[in-house]
Amino acid sequence: NYICARALINAKAWVPQNRIRAYMLFFHREHFSEEFVLIKFQNFLDSLAEKGKTEDTPFISIRSKAPNLEEYKITKGTWAALQKHKARHLEAGRGFGYGLVDDKKPTRTLSARYAKDGAEILIKEPYWRVPRKITVEEGLALMGYNNTFGKQYGFKRGFTFPETMSKAQIYKQLGNSLVPEILSEIASIFVKK
């Protein structure tokens, strides 16, 4: 007894990350008309999907200027393994492998397995032989968890994680998240103006 509106939305218009997610909303027929769900709301979702296809947010907009990024550097062994893995897949005609960030473009998708080796999103720093992972702050920004947005929802110090959480746990939480600004935009259609 429900009507469904759905869309695949890429978050790169809101945050500097290619992150395509399926958004499916179900409306009970007793409370919402087919006209609202299948026309008005579906058109609204389609416009968000189109925005995600046509607009980009560059990574440079959130890139850390922090002086101490050494702790995020991957090891030489991990870097060698990632390069070997990518070369093997390129040779076989497949596109698997690590991804280096281009500051002018959105990154690849941050996944829950990111803490393992950071392969999806690696950042080259000048004069470094090996790249680094994103910082926790960059991870928060990559998902749209910025201080301005956090304060809007009552988080006085912005979005933070408990100090007892490891970086691996934080990356996993971020990798499993949705971009809150997209959810907020979807919910905005229900707010009476």
PLM feature segments, named:
Residues 1-109, 113-115:
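Class I S-adenosyl-L-methionine
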Residues 74-193:
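C-terminal target-recognition/interaction regions appended to catalytic cores
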